[in-house]
Every structure is written in structure tokens, then in C-alpha cells.
Design a protein with these regions (language model features):
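Membrane-embedded and interfacial regions of multi-pass energy-transducing membrane proteins
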Residues: 2-534, 555
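Acidic/proline-rich low-complexity IDRs
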Residues: 4, 537, 575-576
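Short, charged N-terminal extramembrane segments
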Residues: 531-549
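Juxtamembrane cytosolic/matrix-side boundary and N-terminal portion
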Residues: 544-564
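Final/C-terminal transmembrane alpha-helix of multipass membrane proteins
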Residues: 360, 439, 557-573
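Juxtamembrane boundary at the C-terminal end of a transmembrane helix
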Residues: 569-584
Length: 584
């Protein structure tokens, strides 16, 4: 077993270009530090815009309120999808790439000026897209399916953003070469950096598909070429779904990092974790096919091979990480004396540390809700009763929003003191923020999925079809489900608002702290930085359980609970499918 975050030897620090972190001992290249800050701030701005649009959509889909008119609803829905799933997530991931290649490897980054060019290109692209959407020139939803036509500048903005992100990935790879050549670390890449490499490789594949989608779409929008709608859909989902798999790889990397920072989590088996990351690279993009399961232009064989065989290899990777991360946390706790009973390590965990609580909630909601629903609705036969219902956004709000965003939020509470060198403002609010956000999103996702089970459509302004020549009556329970969903969403929005408040205030108006204040554990500094987890010894390993459930018996029990929940949900959906086609 190895620690998740191993500290390489720190080379001599000279000049103003570098500084050494007093907590981790890592050398920080100041240009990389500034680029991390810029991308993190841009991500927070995108989160604010996307969060406001989310509230407007929520209060419209809640039939009792029905806030927006149809034109504005689809405009806001377009902005919400692009801003949250593309701009917020990818800006933050760019910050993660700079962190994983620079500070974690004690390396300088390649071509800092190129980094600023990339950031400027991404920012210009994002602003261009937002302007086109909010001025009513791109009411085409996030997918912008052909033949819906937006202003050419909309497509150009996305191309700018994608090219900037692609260049950051190449800059990341170049930094790895520099670190290897200058021997800033020993042995193989740290696991967190290896996960970031996985995310960057998937990003390159994804962004190349984006170029194959949006460059022709731009030419089509100015009338130079024609496009086939089915080909566009296939290429777009190679971008749209794969972009969320960048999130998965980045999220899992952050899980390992937060585990190490908060409780000194260990890595059970480096080869196993790295193999799981490789499975992501090889198979996760093929899961994009589950968005095309009802499209008549693709054969059943193609659909089944991609979603019922290749996709399961990526699912296997997630399940491996879903075991190794909590097991690493459990063993890390037990090695440090918290070994009473099956779940004594849970009771003694630092639940007041927002970094740790974000980690746990991210793993739980992503696995138990997002993961189980994703595999189920990706099955060809079951998908026929799920496609275009509320069950689809119910799934990805549990994965991207509750899983990925929670991991990013948890990491932020450590980046503020480590990178910005400031206390986390409004510490009490920061401590409850993960519970509000995750709890609200859990209710939101579950009840949205329940409503989808009654056939409530996604992306629809008015499910009552008012003034239509026909009437669609839903089960009376739908109104109650949508009401509870809305309340959960509002609680999550409150949690998201607190995160933005804490982050913005800390970064721009926060107080710097001294080394004495850190050691004294003043408010606003996470526990993992006040009392870093002590190094373990061979004697500590002798205290680990050796029973039939191994060194992590608590995690083994939780895994069995997960598998039981998975089986019940999966086979219940086959039972529901039988109600669609009655025989006899």
C-alpha cells in the first residue's frame, strides 16, 4: 500500500518564479499558480451564470409556478446546459491540469505565455457563446441539433473555446515531458497526475470530435455546405457524452487527492487503480452510443455492442475506483488508530471538514444514484421507456452535478489556502455547504427520476400541453413529485450560492494567514492543513483487521449494500418494461 499523494524531493527554490508550500513541501511555479487562479475564477463565474439559469428553469418546470414563457425557457435552458456542462466544468478541469502537472510534480509548466493565450481564447469563446444565447440568436438547446440553426458566431465561439482547451491539454503533456527530463519526481507519475493524464487524453479525443462536429456546423450555418442530421447527432454525442467522461476521470483523481489531504488515505493497489484509468481511455467514449439507442439509423448490433459490452468495461473501472477510494479512506483511518468496530473509522472521520464531507457525498451520490441509473438506462431495451423523459436529467444531475461538482467544490476548500494562501471565508457556512448542496441534489435527482417514470418529458416547457388540440393527463402523483423536486433543487441552489459566496469572498477579500495561525488551527483552515495526517509505519499495519472481509471490512459491507441496491433497481426496471408490451 502506498500513500495517495507522495512528496518528491523538492529542488532548490531560487528567484521569484517559485515558492514552496509550507504545508505540503511542494514547489509552486508562479505562472502555473496564476493560471490555476484564472481558470478557477472563470469556472466560478460560469457556475454563477449557470446556477441562476438553473433556478429559472426549476421554477418553470414546477408547474405550480411556471415562471418563464416558452421562448425564454428554451433560451435559458440552452444557456444552462452550455454554461454548466461545458464552461464551468472545463475551466475547472484546466485548473486541475495545471495543478497536476506543475505543483504535484514540482515542475515548471511549459510555455506560460501560451497558457494565457489559451485562457484568453477560451474566455472569448465562452463570452461569444453567452452573448449569442442571451440575445436570442441561439435558441437551439445545448445539443443544437440540425436543422435548428444558430448564429454563426455561436458555433465560432464554441470552436474558440474547444481549441483553447485542446491547447491546454497539449501544454499539459509538454509539462510532463519537462518534469521527466528535469527529474523533478521519482519513479512513475503520482496516481493523481496519472488520473489527470487520463482526463487529458479523453479530452483530446473529445475535442477532436467537437471539431468534426462544430466546424462543419459553422460552415453549414453560413450556407456553404449541407449536413446530415443523423451524422451530426452521432458526432455530437461523441463530443457531448465524452466531455462528461473527462469529468469522471478528473473527479476520480480529485477523490484520491482529497482522501490523501483530509485523512491520509492509502492506495490499495497502484496497478489496479491505474488499470481502471486505462479502461476509461479505451472504453468510456463508446458509452456515447446510449444517447442514440432509439435512433433508427444505427443497427441493433452496433447499439448492443457499444452499450452492453464495451460500456461495461468503463463501468468496471468506475466500480474499481468506487471500492478503492473508500477502502483507502478506511485503511488510512484505521492506520491512525480509528479502528473500533466495523464503522468506528466513519464515526471518527472529520465531518466538519468541507473537503472530506464533499469527498464522501460525491462518492455516495455518484455511485448509488448516478452510477446505478446510468448503467440501467444505458441498456438498449430499458432505454426505450427512459429516452427523453425526466429520468435522463435525473441521472446526469446525480453524476455531473452531485458527483463531479461536489468533488470540485471539496477541492476548492483546499486550493484557497494552498494556492491563494487565504483563509476560507464564512467557515461555518462552508462546513454546512456540502450537506445542503448534496442533500438538495439527492432529493432533486431522485424525484426528477420518479417523475420521469410517469412519463414526464425532459426539455419541455408545459407538460399539460395547454391550448393544444389534444390533452395529456399525467398521474396525480406527478404534481407532488415535481413540487418535492423543486424544493430539493432550491435547497441545492442555496448550497451552490453559499459555495460561490465563500469562494468569491475568500479569493478577492479573504484574509491571509500566518504559519502560526495554521498550526493553531484558526477558523477558515481545513483540518487536513492544520494537522496533516501523520505518516504511517509498519507497526501501524499490524493493527489492521485480518478477517474474512480483509483490511477494509466496513467498505466491503458498503460494497455489498451497493451491489444489492444495483440488482434491485436494475431488475425492477426489467419488470417495469414488461408493463409496456402486455402479452395475452
Amino acid at each position: 500500500m502506498a500513500t495517495t499523494l507522495e512528496r518528491p524531493p523538492v529542488p532548490p527554490v531560487t528567484g521569484w518564479v517559485y515558492r514552496t508550500c509550507g504545508v505540503t513541501g511542494l514547489k509552486l511555479h508562479r505562472p502555473a499558480e496564476q493560471l490555476m487562479k484564472a481558470n478557477a475564477v472563470a469556472a466560478t463565474v460560469a457556475l454563477l451564470i449557470g446556477g441562476v439559469s438553473a433556478i429559472l428553469i426549476l421554477l418553470t418546470r414546477w408547474q405550480a409556478v411556471h415562471l418563464l414563457d416558452p421562448v425564454m425557457f428554451y433560451r435559458v435552458l440552452t444557456a444552462h446546459g452550455i454554461t454548466m456542462l461545458i464552461f464551468f466544468i472545463i475551466f475547472f478541469e484546466m485548473a486541475v491540469l495545471y495543478f497536476a502537472a506543475g505543483p504535484l510534480l514540482n515542475s515548471r509548466i511549459a510555455a506560460p505565455k501560451l497558457g494565457w493565450f489559451n485562457f484568453g481564447l477560451m474566455s472569448v469563446g465562452a463570452v461569444l457563446v453567452e452573448v449569442m444565447i442571451w440575445t436570442g440568436k441561439a435558441d437551439v438547446l445545448m445539443t443544437s441539433y440540425i436543422p435548428l440553426r444558430a448564429d454563426p458566431l455561436y458555433y465560432l465561439g464554441i470552436i474558440f473555446f474547444a481549441v483553447g482547451a485542446l491547447l491546454v491539454c497539449f501544454q499539459f503533456f509538454a509539462t510532463l515531458v519537462i518534469a521527466k527530463r528535469e527529474q523533478t519526481y521519482r519513479g512513475s507519475l503520482p496516481l493523481v497526475t496519472f488520473g489527470a493524464v487520463t482526463a487529458a487524453i479523453i479530452a483530446v479525443i473529445t475535442l477532436l470530435h467537437g471539431a468534426a462536429t462544430y466546424i462543419p456546423a459553422f460552415l453549414w450555418s453560413v450556407g456553404l455546405i449541407s449536413m446530415d442530421p443523423q451524422i451530426y447527432r452521432m458526432l455530437w454525442w461523441a463530443l457531448g457524452h465524452s466531455s462528461q467522461q473527462i469529468n469522471v476521470a478528473a473527479m476520480v483523481s480529485i477523490w484520491y487527492l482529497l482522501g490523501a489531504l483530509t485523512v491520509g488515505a492509502v492506495v490499495l493497489n497502484e496497478k489496479l487503480s491505474r488499470t481502471a484509468f486505462v479502461l476509461y481511455i479505451l472504453f468510456i467514449s463508446m458509452a456515447s452510443a446510449h444517447h442514440l439507442l432509439v435512433d433508427p439509423g444505427f443497427s441493433s448490433a452496433w447499439k448492443v455492442v457499444n452499450t452492453s459490452y464495451f460500456m461495461y468495461m468503463a463501468v468496471l473501472a468506475s466500480m474499481l475506483h468506487g471500492f478503492t477510494v473508500p477502502a483507502g479512506v478506511e485503511i488510512g483511518q484505521r492506520l491512525r488508530g480509528y479502528s473500533q468496530g466495523l464503522f468506528g473509522w466513519v464515526k471518527r472521520a472529520p465531518w466538519g471538514d468541507p473537503g472530506f464531507s464533499s469527498l464522501v457525498l460525491s462518492v455516495v451520490v455518484f455511485g448509488f444514484v448516478g452510477g446505478i441509473t446510468g448503467v440501467t438506462i444505458g441498456t438498449e431495451q430499458i432505454n426505450i421507456v427512459v429516452h427523453n423523459t425526466f429520468r435522463v436529467p435525473g441521472h446526469f444531475h446525480a453524476t455531473v452535478v452531485s458527483g463531479t461538482a461536489m468533488a470540485f467544490m471539496g477541492l476548492t476548500y483546499y486550493l484557497i489556502p494552498l494556492i491563494f494562501q487565504k483563509k476560507v471565508a464564512f467557515w461555518r457556512l462552508a462546513q454546512i455547504q456540502p450537506y445542503l448542496f448534496a442533500g438538495g441534489m439527492l432529493v432533486f435527482s431522485i424525484f426528477m427520476s420518479f417523475a420521469g417514470g410517469f412519463g414526464v418529458p425532459r426539455r419541455h416547457w408545459d407538460i399539460t400541453f395547454s391550448n393544444a388540440p389534444f390533452e395529456q393527463a399525467f398521474h396525480p402523483a406527478v404534481d407532488a413529485l415535481l413540487g418535492i423536486m423543486a424544493l430539493g433543487g432550491l435547497v441545492a441552489a442555496l448550497g451552490g450560492g453559499i459555495y460561490i459566496l465563500v469562494t468569491v469572498w475568500s479569493v478577492f477579500f479573504g484574509q491571509r494567514f500566518t504559519e502560526a495561525e495554521r498550526l493553531a488551527g484558526v477558523s477558515g483552515i481545513p483540518q487536513g492543513l492544520v494537522r496533516p495526517p501523520r505518516a504511517t509505519t509498519l507497526a501501524d499495519e499490524d493493527t489492521l483487521p485480518t478477517g474474512r472481509l480483509g483490511h477494509a471490512p466496513g467498505t466491503m459491507v458498503l460494497v455489498l449494500v451497493f451491489l444489492l441496491a444495483f440488482a434491485v433497481y436494475y431488475f425492477a426496471n426489467w419488470k417495469l418494461l414488461s408493463f409496456v408490451w402486455k402479452i395475452g
